[in-house]
């Protein structure tokens, strides 16, 4: 392989004239050393002293030679390999697992870098795969560095890394944009600390073949002297533009590959491979089938055969046969003749790949690239919050990356399946994901990072410091979701994180809804392992539960055997088991839970029986159940990640393990189903939809509507879904329809606030402040209540009743009288919600939850809400005067506790109390029976008792104020 242009003189641009003929890597290393104090440079005082942008064409060695030579700044290349390196590391991020792993292995095996030994001085770290030294050059996916920046302090990062190289920095994934935001903020904070922080501040290098240097230099506030341009490949690439566009790019790609193969039958196998880009796995499978059929024709003509290798992220993660064929030398590969069934040497490999092969991958035998010009990515539309995989023309920058796969070792050929005129019309750069998808799971991270820079400690949208801020409608939707989830609230000065929001912001990758569902699980005493499993199923199965099936013809009936493998024992012998389970659960997510439980049972069975090669037996088990083994493994990994996330922030990931749905009996099963559905409802409340009998459609508060049909459950009145998906109506036209991803029926399981689902009004100024208005006198108490309040009576665990309550009406329960509460509701109240759950025999901890919704912004917000946590019995003795006093005492902040002494081992409020009291430890076996004893504990932590009541020796009610 020839030298990369970084190692050849005369390929520099945008540098002083006297240096244009320098060896680029020498110039770059000298430029860096001049800014390092240990080499005589000055102490850095600005970002210009620590940020360098290198725009280097494909094939220049920016992913290989550059990181190695940067590492050699820290460790001389002549250092003996047996001498362990103990200094700081160099991390080089890659957008994909394939490139991170491949680059590390290639450098470790290269004779050009004898000092770089895999596992000692060079390695890789990705989420599923790791082989890295404790110190050295580490290739990692962007997500690895992002998680470290999210959880570690500035000093911890600085003590670990001397250099951070962000390769393929032009990619605008959400994680990469957030990572750059973190890096910039970290550099600024360390510079503000003066020489103490600046001495060890990491050096940041951004590299790409197609980076927008003006945009990135403006973002980091650096000048042209911080931008170095390097010429790329040493060999030419001929572009073969077609005269006409194609109407069937898959068929045309096959025909083009076959033409190339036949017209270049004398290619040497070491200079013959073809790479074809496809937007998705479905297209890859179809094209692979066509190419295999073409091999049949080649065999009939007695021509050399092609070896077809379909490659996507799943193939890489599993390191399957196709991936191993990609990494092997062509001389060691064989292909079966479809006529004779004998194996023979292929002339060339035809690699059919998604965008995983677009960047950072060097295939030394690659000579031809065929590009249909399409790219598929997730797009989300607001305020409907509906999204899906949309196929659009790839940007020019992506096409240049694809073209750059050839011409690295010898001259190459590029075959676009679109005309040159079309190429000139498409956008130059790809749209960032924060524009096409919205902030999504990184929203709370954006909020926290923005709040850090705000002196008032509030979130202001105009202060978001990103390459591209989120669109206004996407940001408004994210704020709404965070407020409804109880993670964000509007204080006197602006939007602030709640206590739950502060905890949620510490999660590395959980979305707003996922975090809320976990919190609800703790609140309702659900098994958190079940919550984690459900969230993992949603993440992996994506649109529908049938995506877990390993079959081309997928339908719900095929799930039956997989679902039944994980149901509780008492349900396994009923007639028409799957139909009855489907009818009983009325929930795709719970069926997904049982599918995973069956997979888990299989794992335990094989391990307990000490079978050899557990993975092989699990694959066979999945085949019998018609499940994708890879998907089940992904669910297992995702579930473990969620449980680890909870543990990292200090939450018990095995909370109420005994309440798992799979271990339920006949008496507890429905209660646990209700509990899990309640958690889903609270997490995805904005995605509740009611059935409109007149339109025969499901409608929601955002005005969107869709049809939903189930073969067993006919038109349930209320459903909830994790997301609304865009599904193509046809392959020929750019038309989509809305449909729910997974459906959980709420009828009879959850008390749904119907008024909340009414179409919302368009109210301006969500992102700004509230205009000053004259204070209005309070309205009568009666405006507080809805038209009616749904109230569940649960006496025996078998029967439910629902009462309709008029404004001002007194509700009478056995041993209980609760009347209108909390006066002085402001004029701008548009909705209130009062839910009263009275449970005998079952210790539900949620008693009263009052949410007040205001109209001083565009979206719903909780403010001055009161939550009583504890058993209902403790509140039976509270009068209207007690509640009135409570309301005034709690404003603007306070802590409310309802506690039943018999339930101390399971009281949920201990979690909230632990957080409220900071470092003060609360033992779960505490048994304080009197108010003075509790007052002593709270006083030690700075709380003052302001209201207390002890109706009996077993009941306690105290309010404390900070």
From Swiss-Prot:
<keyword id="KW-0347">Helicase</keyword>
<dbReference type="InterPro" id="IPR002464">
    <property type="entry name" value="DNA/RNA_helicase_DEAH_CS"/>
</dbReference>
<feature type="short sequence motif" description="DEAH box">
    <location>
        <begin position="167"/>
        <end position="170"/>
    </location>
</feature>
<keyword id="KW-0426">Late protein</keyword>
<dbReference type="GO" id="GO:0016020">
    <property type="term" value="C:membrane"/>
</dbReference>
<keyword id="KW-0472">Membrane</keyword>
<feature type="binding site">
    <location>
        <begin position="56"/>
        <end position="63"/>
    </location>
    <ligand>
        <name>ATP</name>
    </ligand>
</feature>
<feature type="transmembrane region" description="Helical">
    <location>
        <begin position="521"/>
        <end position="541"/>
    </location>
</feature>
<dbReference type="GO" id="GO:0033644">
    <property type="term" value="C:host cell membrane"/>
</dbReference>
<keyword id="KW-0812">Transmembrane</keyword>
<dbReference type="GO" id="GO:0003723">
    <property type="term" value="F:RNA binding"/>
</dbReference>
<dbReference type="InterPro" id="IPR014001">
    <property type="entry name" value="Helicase_ATP-bd"/>
</dbReference>
<dbReference type="GO" id="GO:0016887">
    <property type="term" value="F:ATP hydrolysis activity"/>
</dbReference>
<feature type="domain" description="Helicase ATP-binding">
    <location>
        <begin position="43"/>
        <end position="229"/>
    </location>
</feature>
<keyword id="KW-0378">Hydrolase</keyword>
<dbReference type="GO" id="GO:0005524">
    <property type="term" value="F:ATP binding"/>
</dbReference>
<dbReference type="GO" id="GO:0003724">
    <property type="term" value="F:RNA helicase activity"/>
</dbReference>
<comment type="similarity">
    <text>Belongs to the DEAD box helicase family. DEAH subfamily.</text>
</comment>
<dbReference type="InterPro" id="IPR029063">
    <property type="entry name" value="SAM-dependent_MTases_sf"/>
</dbReference>
<keyword id="KW-0946">Virion</keyword>
<dbReference type="Pfam" id="PF00270">
    <property type="entry name" value="DEAD"/>
</dbReference>
<dbReference type="GO" id="GO:0044423">
    <property type="term" value="C:virion component"/>
</dbReference>
<dbReference type="InterPro" id="IPR001650">
    <property type="entry name" value="Helicase_C-like"/>
</dbReference>
<keyword id="KW-1043">Host membrane</keyword>
<dbReference type="InterPro" id="IPR011545">
    <property type="entry name" value="DEAD/DEAH_box_helicase_dom"/>
</dbReference>
<protein>
    <recommendedName>
        <fullName>Putative RNA Helicase B962L</fullName>
        <ecNumber>3.6.4.13</ecNumber>
    </recommendedName>
</protein>
<keyword id="KW-0067">ATP-binding</keyword>
<keyword id="KW-1133">Transmembrane helix</keyword>
<feature type="domain" description="Helicase C-terminal">
    <location>
        <begin position="253"/>
        <end position="459"/>
    </location>
</feature>
<dbReference type="InterPro" id="IPR027417">
    <property type="entry name" value="P-loop_NTPase"/>
</dbReference>
<keyword id="KW-0547">Nucleotide-binding</keyword>
């Amino acid at each position: 392989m020839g030298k990369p242009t970084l190692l050849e003189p005369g390929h520099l641009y945008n540098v002083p004239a006297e240096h244009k003929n320098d060896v680029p890597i020498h110039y770059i290393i000298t430029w860096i050393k001049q800014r390092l104090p240990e080499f005589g440079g000055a102490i850095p005082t600005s970002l210009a002293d620590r940020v360098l942008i290198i725009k280097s064409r494909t094939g220049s060695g920016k992913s290989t030679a550059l990181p190695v030579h940067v590492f050699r700044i820290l460790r001389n290349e002549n250092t003996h390999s047996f001498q362990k390196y103990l200094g700081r590391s160099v991390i080089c991020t890659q957008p994909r697992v394939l490139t991170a792993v491949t680059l590390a292995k290639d450098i470790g095996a290269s004779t050009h870098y004898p000092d770089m030994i895999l596992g000692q001085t060079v390695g890789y770290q990705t989420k599923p795969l790791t082989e890295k030294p404790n110190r050295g050059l580490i290739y990692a996916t962007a997500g690895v560095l992002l998680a470290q920046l999210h959880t570690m302090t500035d000093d911890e990062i600085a003590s670990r890394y001397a250099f951070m190289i962000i390769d393929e920095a032009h990619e605008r994934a959400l994680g990469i944009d957030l990572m750059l935001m973190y890096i910039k903020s970290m550099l600024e904070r360390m510079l503000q600390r003066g020489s103490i922080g600046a001495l060890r501040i990491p050096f940041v290098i951004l590299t790409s073949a197609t980076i927008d240097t003006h945009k990135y230099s403006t973002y980091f506030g650096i000048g042209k002297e911080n931008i170095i341009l390097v010429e790329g490949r040493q060999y030419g690439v001929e572009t073969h533009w077609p005269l006409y566009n194609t109407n069937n790019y898959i068929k045309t790609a096959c025909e083009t590959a076959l033409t190339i193969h036949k017209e270049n039958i004398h290619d040497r196998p070491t200079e013959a491979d073809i790479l074809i880009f496809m937007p998705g796995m479905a297209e890859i499978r179809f094209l692979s089938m066509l190419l295999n059929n073409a091999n049949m024709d080649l065999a009939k003509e007695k021509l050399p055969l092609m070896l077809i290798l379909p490659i996507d992220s799943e193939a890489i993660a599993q390191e399957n046969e196709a991936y191993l064929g990609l990494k092997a030398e062509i001389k060691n590969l064989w292909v079966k003749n479809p006529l004779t069934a004998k194996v023979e040497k292929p002339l060339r490999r035809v690699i059919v790949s998604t965008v995983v092969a677009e960047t950072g991958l060097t295939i030394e035998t690659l000579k031809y690239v065929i590009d249909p010009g399409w790219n598929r990515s997730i797009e989300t539309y607001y305020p409907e919050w509906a999204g899906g995989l949309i196929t659009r023309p790839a940007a020019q920058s992506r096409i240049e990356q694809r073209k750059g796969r050839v011409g690295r070792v010898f001259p190459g050929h590029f075959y676009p399946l679109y005309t040159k005129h079309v190429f000139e019309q498409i956008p130059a750069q790809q749209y960032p994901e924060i524009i096409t998808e919205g902030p999504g799971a990184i929203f709370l991270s954006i909020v926290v990072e923005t709040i850090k820079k705000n002196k008032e400690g509030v979130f202001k949208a105009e202060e978001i410091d990103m390459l591209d801020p989120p669109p206004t409608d996407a940001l408004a939707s994210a704020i709404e979701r965070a407020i409804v989830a109880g993670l964000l609230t509007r204080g006197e000065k602006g939007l602030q994180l709640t206590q739950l929001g502060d905890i949620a912001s510490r999660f590395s990758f959980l979305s707003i809804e996922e975090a809320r569902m976990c919190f609800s699980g703790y609140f309702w005493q659900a098994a958190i392992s079940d919550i984690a499993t459900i969230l993992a199923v949603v993440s992996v199965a994506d649109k529908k539960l049938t995506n877990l099936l390993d079959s081309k013809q997928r339908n719900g009936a095929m799930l039956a055997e997989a679902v039944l493998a994980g149901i509780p024992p008492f349900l396994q012998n009923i007639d028409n088991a799957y139909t009855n389970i489907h009818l009983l659960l009325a929930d795709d997510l719970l069926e997904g839970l049982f599918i995973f439980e069956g997979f888990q049972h299989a794992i335990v069975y094989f391990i307990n029986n000490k079978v050899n090669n557990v993975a092989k037996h699990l694959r066979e088990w999945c085949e019998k159940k018609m499940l994708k083994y890879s998907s089940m493994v992904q669910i297992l990994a995702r579930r473990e990640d969620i449980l680890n996330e909870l543990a990292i922030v200090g939450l018990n990931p095995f909370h109420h393990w005994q309440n798992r749905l799979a271990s339920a009996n006949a008496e507890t099963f429905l209660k646990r189903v209700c509990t899990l559905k309640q958690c889903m409802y609270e997490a995805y409340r904005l995605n509740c939809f009611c059935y409109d009998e007149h339109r025969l459609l499901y409608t929601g508060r955002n005005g969107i509507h869709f049809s939903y049909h189930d073969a067993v459950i006919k038109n349930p009145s209320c459903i909830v879904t994790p997301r609304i998906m865009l599904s193509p109506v046809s392959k020929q036209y750019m038309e989509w329809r809305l449909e729910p991803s997974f459906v959980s029926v709420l009828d009879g399981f959850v008390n749904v606030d119907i008024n909340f689902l009414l179409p919302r009004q368009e109210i301006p100024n969500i992102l700004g402040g509230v205009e000053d208005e004259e204070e209005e006198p309070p309205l009568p108490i009666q405006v507080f209540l809805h038209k009616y309040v749904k109230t569940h009576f649960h006496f025996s665990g078998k029967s439910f009743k629902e009462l309709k309550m008029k404004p001002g009406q007194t509700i009478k329960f056995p041993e209980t009288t609760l009347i209108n509460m909390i006066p002085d509701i402001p004029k701008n109240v548009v909705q209130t919600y009062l839910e009263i759950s009275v449970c005998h025999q079952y210790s539900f901890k949620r008693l009263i939850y009052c949410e007040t919704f205001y109209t001083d912004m565009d979206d719903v917000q909780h403010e001055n809400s009161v939550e009583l946590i504890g058993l209902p019995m403790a509140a039976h003795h509270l009068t209207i005067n007690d509640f009135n006093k409570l309301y005034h005492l709690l404003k603007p902040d306070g802590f409310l506790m309802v506690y039943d002494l018999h339930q101390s081992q399971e009281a949920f409020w201990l979690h909230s109390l632990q957080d409220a009291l900071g470092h003060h430890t609360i033992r779960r076996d505490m048994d304080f029976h009197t108010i003075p004893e509790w007052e002593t504990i709270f006083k030690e932590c700075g709380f003052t008792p302001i209201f207390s009541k002890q109706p009996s020796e077993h009941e306690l009610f105290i309010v404390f104020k900070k």
